[in-house]
Amino acid sequence: MTSFQFTKMHGLGNNYIYVNQMKEQLPEEKLSEIAIQVSSIYTGIGSDGMILICPSDVAPVKMRIFNNDGSEGKNCGNGLRCVAKYVYEHQIVTDTTFQIETLSGLVEATVHVQDDHVHLVTVDMGKPRFEKEAMPMLGEPASTTINEPLDFGTTTLNGTAVSMGNPHIVFYLEDIEKAPLDTLGPIIEKHDMFPEGVNVEFVEVVSETELHFRVWERGSGITQACGTGACAAAVSTIVNGQAKKETDMTVHLAGGDLIIRWKDNEHVLMTGPAETICDGTFYL
């Protein structure tokens, strides 16, 4: 029977199965299938997906993300924080600031260490993009969608489209508890206007420095947290004139809080926790 070692980790409840591909070398042709297997709460471990920690030619490590439906994602903020914690605590890297390769490009992570353990991680998530071609989204490639009415058949909502290396559409409401994740999340995620799908965020603005946030993730559904989504929500709030750059913005997610800062140099910084749940052996 084939088996591999794994570590289950979470960032604010957004939990993945982490596999060190430098040791395990799971076969490429079976990665999607394995991701579905390990993610199952009935016949697997139970998770939002699987993240591989791989060798890289351009950075100390490369991160690959597989959602619980087997699709491969391009970026994951909570996953990046957990990868940073893993590689530092397993002495794959020794510097406290280092780069991680993703399908969206290189990102820089800084681990905050206390008693030899990483308790917080700051990740430079890069520059947001707003053009439809960056999402991608149907329409004029160079045009943007900022607080524009979008027709989803059963309803029309004003949305702001932001790419943080993966696609996000942000909607605002007055009460986050009324966010229609179950009903509208799957409809919007797979709507024709988003050829590659989209992450769906609902946001309640409390103040210039505080947001409430809920998410329906592309390929995973409702999750406790989404780091790139929190970045998209903060950036969207600023471009919609409800907050300012160079301000620490606390984003309250279902699983806890992230601190987001959109800097004057256009880079978005995300700071939050990363936790190890357990280690184990998975039998295929």
UniProtKB/Swiss-Prot annotation:
Keywords: Amino-acid biosynthesis, Cytoplasm, Isomerase, Lysine biosynthesis. The record marks 168, 217 as: Could be important to modulate the pK values of the two catalytic cysteine residues. SUPFAM superfamilies: Diaminopimelate epimerase-like. The keyword DNA damage does not apply. Belongs to the diaminopimelate epimerase family. Homodimer. Catalyzes the stereoinversion of LL-2,6-diaminopimelate (L,L-DAP) to meso-diaminopimelate (meso-DAP), a precursor of L-lysine and an essential component of the bacterial peptidoglycan. This is Diaminopimelate epimerase. It comes from Bacillus pumilus (strain SAFR-032).
